[in-house]
Amino acid sequence: MELLIKAFIMGIVEGLTEFLPISSTGHLIIVGKFIHFTGNFATMFEIVIQLGAILAVVFHYRKKIFASLKNLKPGSWGFNLWFKIFIAFIPAAVIGLLTHKYIEEHLFSPFTVAIALIAGAIMMIVIEDTFGKRYKIDNMDKVDTKKSLLIGIAQVMSLFPGMSRSASTIMGGMLAGLSVKAAAEFSFFLAIPTMFAATTLSLLKGFSAMSLLEWQALAVGFITSFLTALFVVDKFLSYLTRHSLKPFAYYRLAVGVLMILLVAEKIVK
């Protein structure tokens, strides 16, 4: 029962944070330390529940996705959409494959997450103040190949635990001239191949036999992550039509500073 409760908590954390610019990986590391949810199963669990979050995006955009897949002839709207997503996917995919092992071995710690949270927060504030109201593109369908590549290059920052894939791609979108909402929508679509590839790679490397209780925990985490992420995606897009990203930046700063203090006091290692 204790494992199922932890799975429920971690599923909520993943669903709440995956598509907000506050780093799901960072929060999973931090919360996992506090509730003592660590080890090989925890690592695989965190990978699997990301699939729940991916499915939430697919479900939210199901009409647009299905419409785009009906016509993939070169030059068509559907082809252009997924070609641009593919271009944006390449930089993080290549660099991620080359650095995956090093990152897992050396950067998955509360302290490095705290530094990334703070650095990302400062970048979010500066970029929004500088580019937030200068956008020329208010629809992700208007993004061209060069801008897609710029967003993809920005996504490389998210390989550093705590930086946030969502924050990195939204900031990249704003630098490319997109409105915050258009950047967020592009980020959501880019999440589909990016997270699916990362999850598949990690599962191929780390999947192992599990007990019945562990299978139940996976199911609880997956479903909880899906339902929570589905709620967050809808509300976050509505929020961005009227509000700033700065509250998320201030939250990142607060959590980052708190984590550094906890590490310094050896409360968290």
UniProtKB/Swiss-Prot annotation:
* TM region(s), chain numbering: 41-61, 78-98, 107-127, 148-167, 184-204, 213-233, 248-268
Q: Which InterPro entries match?
A: UppP
* Assigned protein family: Belongs to the UppP family.
This protein's GO cellular component annotations are: plasma membrane
- Entry protein name: Undecaprenyl-diphosphatase
Claim: Lipid metabolism is one of the keywords in the record: no
Q: Which reaction does it catalyse?
A: di-trans,octa-cis-undecaprenyl diphosphate + H2O = di-trans,octa-cis-undecaprenyl phosphate + phosphate + H(+)
Q: Where in the cell is it found?
A: Cell membrane
